[in-house]
A protein has these predicted regions:
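PLP-dependent class I/II
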Residues: 1-36, 40-378
Length: 378
């Protein structure tokens, strides 16, 4: 027997559920929606973006997707015509980007985050890589920035973001802003600023800079990976280009309705005046505090280990320590026909049962590892 909703749910959550159902044609989640997603849900997301940034947002700029990944693939399909089209990607990199670029036949143009400055993004290096690629006949079309960083866990300084936006404008690049960890900030001296906010703060309008911003329900404090909800917000594109984006999105008909609903809830959560707010805030704060404790515990533990250096845990869900292996271990790895960090990771697994990911899998050239811990509560 289904209990009366009022006996187990707050009045505002019941009201929100009714409002959402009213937005869906037929009041059911089993039918197709508009290819960009249900208009009322996009309105809710636009409202959340505007509240976050302090600048207006338009529901027509929002494409709801099955997580952020399909939005990345869509833009790669749009941007890449052949192997001479390049995309600037940070190294260490989230493998989604290299895989998507390869899938669509383009060229990955790496730029290297500076480990000695907390995995900082240095415009001088990005410019060097851009010029080198252009000298080889590669038409570099976009710059990917992941903030907070995956797999490096850094949070970009606001001043650095201004430099990035100006660089993209001057060089005629599309800015692809992966912001799916925007809620995961652990350093007291760091704050998330969306690139949309940075662009508008500079006074740039629709004619100045093409920007694609990604968000997902898989990360943050919600972590609903299997629900496959997310969106991309596109601004600064001409009408003919927007038409092509819509055509590509239409090929997949629409994203799943449950994920669309979750994306709207993530960007438009309970307000302080709502009955459910205290419960929502307690759970949110508890999850983020637990993630911060785990990040700090690992950071401190790594700093005490001989031969290991690790930057501070600022955001996302990752630490990226560097392991200095002795020459004998490097020679043993070579004899086993394995990369030194992969050799170390396998030996660690065999000896302790601890799973780490070799840094070389993220394009890192030094002997580094990523350790990800999300399950143990501290």
């Amino acid at each position: 027997m289904i209990p009366d909703a009022s006996s187990c749910c707050s009045a505002d959550s019941i009201s929100r559920a009714k409002q959402i159902l009213a937005l869906i044609p037929g009041r059911a989640t089993g039918a197709y929606s508009h290819s960009q997603g249900i208009k009322g849900l996009r309105d809710a997301i636009a409202s959340g973006i505007a509240s976050r940034d302090g600048f207006p947002a338009n529901a027509d700029d929002i494409f709801l997707t099955d997580g952020a990944s399909p939005g990345v693939h869509l833009m790669m399909q749009l941007l890449i015509r052949n192997e001479k089209d390049g995309i600037l990607v940070p190294i260490p990199q989230y493998p989604l980007y290299s895989a998507s670029i390869a899938l669509h036949g383009g060229s990955l143009v790496p730029y290297y985050l500076n480990e000695s400055t907390g995995w900082g993004l240095e415009i001088s290096d990005v410019k060097k890589q851009l010029e080198d690629a252009r000298s080889r006949g590669i038409d570099v079309r976009a710059l990917v920035v992941i903030n907070p960083g995956n797999p490096t866990g850094q949070v970009l300084a606001e001043e650095n973001q201004y430099d990035i936006v100006k660089f993209c404008k001057n060089e005629g690049l599309v800015l692809l802003a992966d912001e799916v960890y925007q809620e995961n900030i652990y350093a007291d001296n760091k704050k998330f600023h969306s690139f949309k906010k940075i662009v508008r703060s500079l006074g740039y309008g629709e004619e100045d800079l093409p920007l694609v911003s990604y968000q997902s329900v898989s990360k943050g404090y919600y972590g609903e990976c299997g629900k496959r909800g997310g969106y991309m917000e596109i601004t600064g594109f001409s009408a003919p280009v927007r038409e092509q984006i819509y055509k590509i999105a239409s090929v997949n008909l629409c994203s799943n309705i449950t994920g669309q609903i979750l994306a709207s809830l993530v960007m438009n959560p309970p307000k302080a005046s709502d009955e459910s707010y205290a419960s929502y805030k307690a759970e949110k704060d508890g999850i983020l505090a637990s993630l911060a404790r785990r990040a700090k515990a690992l950071e401190v533990a790594f700093s005490k280990l001989e031969g290991i250096t690790c930057n501070k845990a600022e955001g996302a869900m990752y630490l990226f320590p560097q392991i200095c292996l002795p020459q004998k271990a490097i020679e043993a790895a070579k004899a086993a026909n394995k990369a030194p960090d992969a050799f170390y990771a396998l030996r660690l697994l065999e000896s302790t049962g601890i799973v780490v990911v070799p840094g070389s899998g993220f394009g890192q050239v030094t002997i580094s590892l990523v350790e990800i811990s999300r399950k143990t509560n501290i």
